[in-house]
């Protein structure tokens, strides 16, 4: 049976981890959200989130975006390539409802899977 936990080892925790992804990322994005990815040598994917107060003013909206993004990652973690991902929320992401945000994330995860197979 597949485990769908979201443990500490599946998160980017230090600034060095984020910098690693920002240096040479593969990009997949929509006008509201961008996912940067870079292959890692760990054998499993990891995720980091950046939801700036400048782009999403209200704390409950930032929390909702982060919660939905983590849940989307948690459910797809076994299909994703061994990459470090940084999800960057842009202006307008707070205007998306939960379903639209989830669908956008699914589309971006699939695009990253295709990009990883191509490289």
UniProtKB/Swiss-Prot annotation:
A biological process from GO: tRNA 5'-leader removal
Reaction(s) catalysed (UniProt annotation): Endonucleolytic cleavage of RNA, removing 5'-extranucleotides from tRNA precursor
Keywords assigned: Endonuclease, Hydrolase, Nuclease, RNA-binding, tRNA processing
GO molecular function: 3'-tRNA processing endoribonuclease activity; ribonuclease P activity; tRNA binding
One Pfam family from the record: Ribonuclease_P
Gene Ontology cellular component annotations, sorted alphabetically: ribonuclease P complex
Statement: the UniProt record of this protein carries the keyword tRNA processing: yes
Domain of life: Bacteria
EC number, UniProt record: 3.1.26.5
Transmembrane domains' residue ranges: none
Family: Belongs to the RnpA family.
PANTHER family: RIBONUCLEASE P PROTEIN COMPONENT (PTHR33992:SF1)
Function (record text): RNaseP catalyzes the removal of the 5'-leader sequence from pre-tRNA to produce the mature 5'-terminus. It can also cleave other RNA substrates such as 4.5S RNA. The protein component plays an auxiliary but essential role in vivo by binding to the 5'-leader sequence and broadening the substrate specificity of the ribozyme.
Self-association state and partner proteins as the record states: Consists of a catalytic RNA component (M1 or rnpB) and a protein subunit.
This protein's name: Ribonuclease P protein component
Species for this entry: Salmonella paratyphi A (strain AKU_12601)
Source taxonomy: Bacteria, Pseudomonadati, Pseudomonadota, Gammaproteobacteria, Enterobacterales
């Amino acid at each position: 049976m597949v485990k769908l936990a979201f443990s500490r080892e599946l998160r980017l925790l230090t600034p060095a981890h984020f910098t690693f992804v920002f240096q040479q990322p593969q990009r997949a994005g929509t006008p509201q959200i961008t996912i940067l990815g870079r292959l890692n040598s760990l054998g499993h994917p990891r995720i980091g989130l950046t939801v700036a107060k400048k782009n999403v003013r209200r704390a409950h909206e930032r929390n909702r975006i982060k919660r939905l993004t983590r849940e989307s990652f948690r459910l797809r973690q076994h299909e994703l390539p061994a990459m470090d991902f940084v999800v960057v929320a842009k202006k307008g992401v707070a205007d998306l409802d939960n379903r639209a945000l989830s669908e956008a994330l699914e589309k971006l995860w699939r695009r990253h899977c295709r990009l990883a197979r191509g490289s």
